[in-house]
Amino acid sequence: MSSTEPSDQLAVGLTQVARYRAFPETAGGFTLPNAQSSDRHIFFSLPGAIAVPAVIYWRTRRFGKPAFSIRINDFTATQYTFVDGDEAERTWHEIIPATTNAGPTLRPDNNELTFFARDGSLVFGDVVILYTSNQTTIPLHA
């Protein structure tokens, strides 16, 4: 007699893979404020993004004591004002929550990343978002 009986239950697995989105338009850095504006908006997609906490990374180089903020859709990732003791160059990271009151923080499409700076000059660069996707492959667009 066997102590193992066949299961009547079917297990269903959900695909979840770690992905990253590097922003090539930030590789050389961009300065805010500039002659045109004190903010910069980047619109982007994250194929298969699901409502799981994510991470954003970026670097800054400051001139003076600027204040800045970074928003991702309805979430303010960072608000900071530099002081005299702060280093001129710095790398940053922030956790992006899975959801806000408006719904998922990151979406597969129609995301907006907003950089703002005032009271000095700040170079932002090398922006990367790590996120969780439900797609194992992503189509390449020519």
Each language-model region and where it sits:
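Beta-strand-rich recognition domains
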Residues: 1-142
